[in-house]
Amino acid sequence: MNKKYLRDLMNNDLSPLIKDTGIEFYDVEYSNNNGKNILTFYIEKDDGLISIDDCELINNKISDKLDEIDPISDPYYLEIASVDITTPFTRDKDFKKNLGNVVIVNLYQKLDSKKEFKGILTDFNDTEISLELEKKEIKIERSNISSIKLSLFD
């Protein structure tokens, strides 16, 4: 399933349905777990406290629209999940929030013969990020980042 298509669906078709809730979509993911197709929407609130009632509310608000659009031809389970410390980030506001923190960056293509880096996120712009490694700083093109998330251990 095309990630861009799912993000466009989330941003253009589903976000307006939850606008009045104080809850925002963070990201969307389509996966297969033990033969079960799962469409997961990650949600967040400014205060960071997502309850089971919030998940149920969002599920109820978007289910009918998903049935109408029918974005996935195969049967799937709809899952609404909260963002946590292990959730990869992609938005500028997430990069800004994590400046100065230790992050783990996974790449599509190797850079300096490595596909994973762990370092301090020191800067970012529309096209690249800067990481401070042990003795040097490197720049990584954002288009080459498959995932970036906060490191649980420094």
Curated annotation (Swiss-Prot):
Entry keyword Transmembrane helix: no
Gene Ontology CC: cytosol
Zinc as UniProt keyword: no
InterPro entries per the UniProt record, alphabetical: Ribosome_maturation_RimP, RimP_C, RimP_C_sf, RimP_N, RimP_N_sf
Protein location: Cytoplasm
Keywords: Cytoplasm, Ribosome biogenesis
Source superkingdom: Bacteria
Protein's GO biological process: ribosomal small subunit assembly; translation
Protein family: Belongs to the RimP family.
HAMAP family per record: RimP
Record function comment: Required for maturation of 30S ribosomal subunits.
The protein, known as: Ribosome maturation factor RimP
Naturally occurring in which organism (per UniProt): Finegoldia magna (strain ATCC 29328 / DSM 20472 / WAL 2508) (Peptostreptococcus magnus)
Species classification: Bacteria, Bacillati, Bacillota, Tissierellia, Tissierellales
Gene name of the record: rimP
